[in-house]
Amino acid sequence: MEKIPMTRAGYDQLDEELRELRSVQRPAVIRAIAEAREHGDLSENAEYHAAREKQSFVEGRIKELEMILSRAEVIDPTRLNGSIKFGATVTLVDEDSEEERTYQIVGEAEADLERGLLNIRSPLARALIGKDEGDSIEVVTPGGGKSYEIISIRYV
């Protein structure tokens, strides 16, 4: 099976979510199902069906997290340097708007653009891999092409 690269912070976040699902949410759903069963006829019991649906979601997410964490390859970005690779924190300037943005290149399971965590498989991350400070890149987006200049690369 293919390894899933991720940072220690990303691994810890997913592991904490898994613990929460197993120790808090799963038991709560089981209690909700038991309570709903006490109300009698299950065929028209909305509480029962809602609890079963929630159980399905919780169990599915537990399986997904177990699979991701079993295949995880934790990479320590502080041990890296040089050109851009997984784990790099990159500051870019949009060459059109002059807007500065900072992203850390992370694994798919921990990506969150709002927090500046860029999926390594995204078009922007793929364009950045292997580049150095001062390089310019072109990225094709649904809204058209964008040009960025790489201002800094850090491994933190």
Swiss-Prot record:
Transmembrane segments: none annotated. It comes from the Bacteria. The keyword Coiled coil applies. One of its GO terms (biological process) is regulation of DNA-templated transcription elongation. Keywords: Coiled coil, DNA-binding, Transcription, Transcription regulation. It holds the Pfam family GreA_GreB_N. Residues 46-66 form a coiled coil. The keyword Ribonucleoprotein does not apply. SUPFAM superfamilies: FKBP-like, GreA transcript cleavage protein, N-terminal domain. One of its GO terms (molecular function) is RNA polymerase binding. Belongs to the GreA/GreB family. NCBIfam families: greA, PRK00226.1-2, PRK00226.1-4, PRK00226.1-5. Necessary for efficient RNA polymerase transcription elongation past template-encoded arresting sites. The arresting sites in DNA have the property of trapping a certain fraction of elongating RNA polymerases that pass through, resulting in locked ternary complexes. Cleavage of the nascent transcript by cleavage factors such as GreA or GreB allows the resumption of elongation from the new 3'terminus. GreA releases sequences of 2 to 3 nucleotides. This is Transcription elongation factor GreA. It comes from Paracoccus denitrificans (strain Pd 1222).
